[in-house]
Structure formats: structure tokens, C-alpha cells
Swiss-Prot record:
Heterotetramer of two alpha chains and two epsilon chains in early embryonic hemoglobin Gower-2; two zeta chains and two epsilon chains in early embryonic hemoglobin Gower-1. The modification Phosphoserine is found at S14, S51. It comes from Lagothrix lagotricha (Brown woolly monkey). Belongs to the globin family. GO terms for cellular component: blood microparticle; haptoglobin-hemoglobin complex; hemoglobin complex. Keywords: Heme, Iron, Metal-binding, Oxygen transport, Phosphoprotein, Transport. This is Hemoglobin subunit epsilon. The gene is HBE1. PANTHER family: HEMOGLOBIN FAMILY MEMBER (PTHR11442), HEMOGLOBIN SUBUNIT EPSILON (PTHR11442:SF7). One of its GO terms (biological process) is hydrogen peroxide catabolic process.
């Protein structure tokens, strides 16, 4: 289990409160699909993923990105119990969708980049460390069913 200090929790929640989940979620998933094109195989029903502009403009990518980032709200509310919080999603992604758990880590890293670009100077090294810790812990929780 990962322990978050009060300072880390504050750093995470302060930025989360300013986050445009719809915009950032679509951007994060879109960038994942562009930078790591093999991840596109999990989204066959999303239509045109033929180019970066097609991916970033795809309404299904944006909608699913929002859904993914919305699930991070559960992580923020349950930082001390991520394994239980993501147990059902872990099972879904492992047993039904067969998603490589490495993709969770990649998406987390993309999310940190999105945060840095959106928040600039507010995204201090301390804030980055707290968010990196959270996305890593979420990736581990999502990959738990695989072990």
C-alpha cells in the first residue's frame, strides 16, 4: 500500500480542483494513442485513428478519455485504498479486455505531462512528485488482477 502525506494529498487535490476533466482526459488518451500506436488495438470501434489529428479530434477518444480521467477522481478520493477502489476495473481490463498492464503506466506518465503543460509554474517539482506517485500507484492497482 502506498502512503500519501498530507502535503502530497494537498498538492494532488489542489490541481485536481482546477482540472478540466473532459479536455485533459481526451488529450491524455489521444496522446497515448499517438505516442504509443500499439495501444490503438484496444479501440477498434473508435473509428478513424489514422493520424494524430484524427485521433485528437475523435469524439470517441475524447469521451473515453473523459471517462478514464473521471475514474481518477475515485483515486483522489480513495488514495489510501487504491487496490480496492480499482479492483473491478483491474478485473475488467485483465479478464475481459486483455489490456497489457504496462499501458496503465504509460497513460499515467502521459497524464503527468498533460498536467505540466496545463498548469505551468503551478506544476512544481513537489506537485510533479505527488502526481507521479499517484499515477504509479493507480497503475499498480489497475494491474493487480494480473498478478
Amino acid at each position: 500500500m502506498v502512503h500519501f502525506t498530507a502535503e502530497e494529498k494537498a498538492a494532488i487535490t489542489s490541481l485536481w480542483g482546477k482540472m478540466n476533466v473532459e479536455e485533459a482526459g481526451g488529450e491524455a488518451l489521444g496522446r497515448l494513442l499517438v505516442v504509443y500506436p500499439w495501444t490503438q488495438r484496444f479501440f477498434d470501434n473508435f473509428g478513424n485513428l489514422s493520424s494524430p489529428s484524427a485521433i485528437l479530434g475523435n469524439p470517441k477518444v475524447k469521451a473515453h478519455g473523459k471517462k478514464v480521467l473521471t475514474s481518477f477522481e475515485d483515486a483522489i478520493k480513495n488514495m489510501d485504498n487504491l487496490k480496492t477502489t480499482f479492483a473491478k476495473l483491474s478485473e475488467l481490463h485483465c479478464d475481459k479486455l486483455h489490456v497489457d498492464p504496462e499501458n496503465f503506466r504509460l497513460l499515467g506518465n502521459v497524464m503527468v505531462i498533460i498536467l505540466a503543460t496545463h498548469f505551468g509554474k503551478e506544476f512544481t517539482p513537489e506537485v510533479q512528485a505527488a502526481w507521479q506517485k499517484l499515477v504509479s500507484a493507480v497503475a499498480i492497482a489497475l494491474g493487480h488482477k494480473y498478478h
